[in-house]
Amino acid sequence: MLNKNSASSQSLPRVHSFFNMIPSIMQDDLALTILNDRDNMFSIKSQRSHGEDLIVTPFAQILASLRSVRNNLLSLTNVPASNKSRRPNQSSSASRSGNPPGAPLSQGEEAYTRLATDTIEELDWCLDQLETIQTHRSVSDMASLKFKRMLNKELSHFSESSRSGNQISEYICSTFLDKQQEFDLPSLRVEDNPELVAANAAAGQQSAGQYARSRSPRGPPMSQISGVKRPLSHTNSFTGERLPTFGVETPRENELGTLLGELDTWGIQIFSIGEFSVNRPLTCVAYTIFQSRELLTSLMIPPKTFLNFMSTLEDHYVKDNPFHNSLHAADVTQSTNVLLNTPALEGVFTPLEVGGALFAACIHDVDHPGLTNQFLVNSSSELALMYNDESVLENHHLAVAFKLLQNQGCDIFCNMQKKQRQTLRKMVIDIVLSTDMSKHMSLLADLKTMVETKKVAGSGVLLLDNYTDRIQVLENLVHCADLSNPTKPLPLYKRWVALLMEEFFLQGDKERESGMDISPMCDRHNATIEKSQVGFIDYIVHPLWETWADLVHPDAQDILDTLEENRDYYQSMIPPSPPPSGVDENPQEDRIRFQVTLEESDQENLAELEEGDESGGESTTTGTTGTTAASALSGAGGGGGGGGGMAPRTGGCQNQPQHGGM
């Protein structure tokens, strides 16, 4: 899809994507069907892409309909087609009559009347959609709202299946939706009930709000950036003429060199690199990549300065974190490097853009505390106050990284012109902020809209001739790298899952000790790891990688194949549900209400997009455990682990136990 026309081939597998959870229709059936179902997908055949393609984003659907209307008018009016501004017609735009695009019809024929009626209905649908578009919202917002509705519907069904399904649904909702949600609470929270507060006080317990006010340690003044160590280490570490071959001093240089020779390979043995580099994986991986790409030369970065900065940066990753440490940063950086090498992207990005993407991957989790954004917000942390609860960790990572550049001997961009430096800084900020997992749906919607619009337009080529389009691809590229663990060889994937779950459990332990509500997937006594991985792949990872694979087709097919094999493994490892135990004296005791309620602004926009849908524009779905799951995917849930850096962020829906805690 980028700067080249790919040959026709088989469609990419869409086995587990939530895009497939609704029926698909051929574009030439649109006029009769789409008026009754706003969630339907278009299926078009493109000679310029790869077989049959599903169109799900609203803007691309409108564009496809208008192209169909145009072709129908050519058939109805016998007006010669003008080639001044239109690309050649695609076979996907054939009319319902079965005639090729532009084939003349005679008045009075049944096919003529049917085609005229279909054309009017299709044009009316397009007008309805265009009339409801708000001028202050982008076309990508239309897709994002639609995807949220699809995801909410599926999570509601899944939450009905079991307590674990409810917990997993809550995790996905709270992690991957970027809007703060309003909650319909079935009962008072502990800290809102005076009697419960008094009882807990007598027992020596505290609510989350009380704990935050009385126990939160005072951080540094907000005029300073917390987490920056003083004095900074490694300022003058490399004073000699000879620099280490791979950027780090290690007695196992030969073994390390062998592994680093595979940096362009997907699924490198990153854990061995961490061992052979004496726990300096980020420094050696970044140094080797920048050397091999000749970025030190093209960006005029002194090698000694680069190593000073990278060593200082790596020191500011928290080594005690099981997951969010410098090894994870090295893994994301190496994955970003491989994705930048994909043939479809050859020659697309400048050295400044490539260097910016790799730099963003290096710094994207620096000084991560091993806690989620939502934990920092709930505990009224200094960081949450500083960044107004918005992308708290991501803003902090950026602030720390750019502050480290100001340290003497660490400014790797010192030789850049002011304009270049400003451009790179803007790129890095945009990319790192996009690693906030609550932005996932917006990123996916943007990418899907871009890909499908080009498919419908018939070009099959993305020019990427402006900053918005170029940074959008780079943001999604690094986002894919950050969510790449489920696409790696199974032994690596399983190891990452174990590390991430341990970090989640450590947060859950803190929450339990502090009297706070335990976050979804953070209770080590109530974990559903295998099931969560299946759902995480089905609802989050596969849709993202599927769309990326469409963009760079066919370069990511092997990655998709591995992803599906890993999904099947975890599906096979889900333990059977325990048999029902005796008679439940109080069947309501264990029932948990799951509810997804969108913001008022999102409700209004969804209502506009869904007018005429059988749901009547409602944006709230409710279910309870103990009923049969209506999900189209067997065993699908969500969230869990193994998706590099995926941690619950701001916003989302909550499970509210009707009787006590989770």
Curated annotation (Swiss-Prot):
Q: Could you tell me where the Gly residues compositional bias lies? A: 635-646
Cofactor requirement? a divalent metal cation
- Compositional bias segments (type: Acidic residues): 599-616
**Name of this chain's protein:** 3',5'-cyclic-AMP phosphodiesterase, isoform F
Q: What are its E.C. numbers?
A: 3.1.4.53
Tell me the ranges covered by the PDEase domain, including all copies.
Answer: 248-577
Query: PROSITE patterns of this UniProt entry?
Result: PDEASE_I_1, PDEASE_I_2
Q: Residue spans with biased composition (Low complexity)?
A: 617-634
Gene expressing this chain: dnc
> Which reaction does this chain catalyze?
3',5'-cyclic AMP + H2O = AMP + H(+)
Q: Which family does this protein fall into?
A: Belongs to the cyclic nucleotide phosphodiesterase family. PDE4 subfamily.
Please name the catalytic residues of this protein. Answer: 324 (proton donor)
Residues annotated as binding 3',5'-cyclic AMP: 324-328, 365, 482, 533
Q: In this chain's numbering, which residues are marked as the site (Binds AMP, but not cAMP)?
A: 485
Q: What does this protein do?
A: Hydrolyzes the second messenger cAMP, which is a key regulator of many important physiological processes. Vital for female fertility. Required for learning/memory.
Q: Does the keyword Electron transport apply?
A: no
Which EC main class describes this enzyme? hydrolase
- Pathway where this protein functions: Purine metabolism; 3',5'-cyclic AMP degradation; AMP from 3',5'-cyclic AMP: step 1/1
Q: How does it assemble?
A: Monomer.
Q: Does the keyword Hydrolase apply?
A: yes
Please list the residues that bind a divalent metal cation 2. Answer: 365
Q: Which GO terms describe its cellular component?
A: synapse
Keyword list (alphabetical) reads: cAMP, Hydrolase, Metal-binding
List the Pfam families hit by this protein, alphabetically: PDE4_UCR, PDEase_I
Positions with biased composition (Polar residues): 80-98, 652-662
